[in-house]
Design a protein with these regions (language model features):
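Beta-strand->loop->alpha-helix junctions that form or flank phosphate-binding loops
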Residues: 75, 193-196, 206-225, 246-249, ...
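Charged, amphipathic alpha-helical linker segments immediately N-terminal to NTP-binding catalytic cores
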Residues: 1-20
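Conserved catalytic-core segment of NTP-binding enzymes
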Residues: 143-147, 152-212
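Nucleotide phosphate-binding/pyrophosphate-handling subdomain across enzymes
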Residues: 42-44, 131, 136-141, 148-159, ...
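A conserved segment at the C-terminal end of the G1
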Residues: 44-48, 56-73
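ATP-dependent carboxylate-amine ligase catalytic core
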Residues: 6, 20, 26, 30-34, ...
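Acidic-glycine-rich active-site phosphate/pyrophosphate-binding loop
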Residues: 95-99, 224-239
Length: 307
């Protein structure tokens, strides 16, 4: 059994542990997760997939729940500067010590099961979150959905932010095939939120086939921009005077709207005031996403690899 004194030591070893950098499938991660967590206990869970907008939706959810005072864990990838950014509790990256302790626990139970770098990280986040008395955990899919390691956890809400052409070697070359892969996060009798304005029919059909409760933007929920604010609507619920999203771009109204619906759908278990929603939307930030760096010369930084 391997053990290392530093986070760098663990990460260097993990990069060489598995023969493939990307190896989709749930069997390996699920086997180790069962050994780590035989009772299957977990916090309330929102899983977010999508070609673009996953990280933004996670950011809105995290900040809304934190504004209400809940204890929130968020898992996302990749990191910008430091590995710890992937695993946050209450908006702060967890320590090297916590990550290394989780790595050691995983190593102690994995036996001869080979894990990819991403699978190790996903299991680490889940293990840390399970031990942290969270009110809710927010999980960002790494690639696709159906066979992504995040999908070993059954979500209480599944959210798909958008469908575009990406990772065609693994997900297929059409929006239809990619949508089917991402729809793998849907569960029976569980809300499935779609933030894409023109979702492929295959995505809608997958929701029906899985008996998920489908909510589509511009049909089941929508937003309306005012002069300096915007309003959100779903059924009989109306949230007025929302501030401009902290993340910039017209598409961020869709992402924020999808996140708000997720919050509203979980309101019986985790009530959130409209004031907290307003504050969370306003305060959301994301490293490397239209990030304005104010120095002597203003710099706009964006690391998104899709248009």
């Amino acid at each position: 059994m391997m053990n290392f004194d530093s986070l760098k030591g663990w990460l260097d070893w993990q990069e060489s542990l598995h023969p493939l950098a990307i190896d989709l499938g749930l069997v390996r991660a699920a086997r180790v997760y069962q050994a780590l967590n035989p009772d299957g206990n977990k916090p309330l869970t929102i899983t977010v997939a999508g070609t673009n907008g996953k990280g933004s939706c996670i950011a809105y959810l995290e900040n809304i729940y934190r504004a209400e005072g809940y204890r929130v864990g968020s898992y996302s990838s990749p990191h910008i500067l430091k590995y710890n950014e992937r695993i946050k509790i209450d908006g702060k990256p967890v320590s090297d010590e916590l990550i290394c302790q989780a790595f050691a626990r995983i190593e102690s139970v994995r036996g001869d099961t080979s894990l990819s770098y991403f699978e190790f990280g996903t299991l680490t986040a889940l293990d840390i979150f399970r031990r942290s008395e969270l009110d809710i955990q927010l999980l960002e899919v790494g690639l696709g959905g159906r066979l992504d390691a995040v999908n070993i956890v059954d979500p209480d809400i599944a959210l798909i932010s958008s469908i575009g052409i990406d990772h065609v070697d693994w997900l297929g070359a059409t929006r239809s095939s990619i949508a089917q892969e991402k729809a793998g996060i849907f569960r029976a009798n569980t809300p499935a939120i779609i933030g894409d304005c023109e979702p492929p029919l295959s995505l809608l059909q997958c929701a029906v086939d899985k008996s998920a409760h489908l909510f589509c933007i511009n049909k089941d929920f929508h937003y309306q921009k005012q002069t300096t604010t915007w309003d959100w609507f779903s059924g009989n619920t109306h949230i007025s005077d929302l501030p401009e999203p902290g993340l910039k771009g017209e598409h961020q109204y869709r992402n924020a709207s999808s996140a708000i619906l997720a919050v509203e759908l979980l309101a019986k278990k985790l009530p959130v005031s409209h004031d907290s929603i307003r504050l969370g939307v306003k305060n959301s930030q994301l490293l490397g996403r239209f990030q304005l760096i104010n120095d002597k010369i203003p710099v706009l930084l964006d690391v998104g690899h899709n248009p």
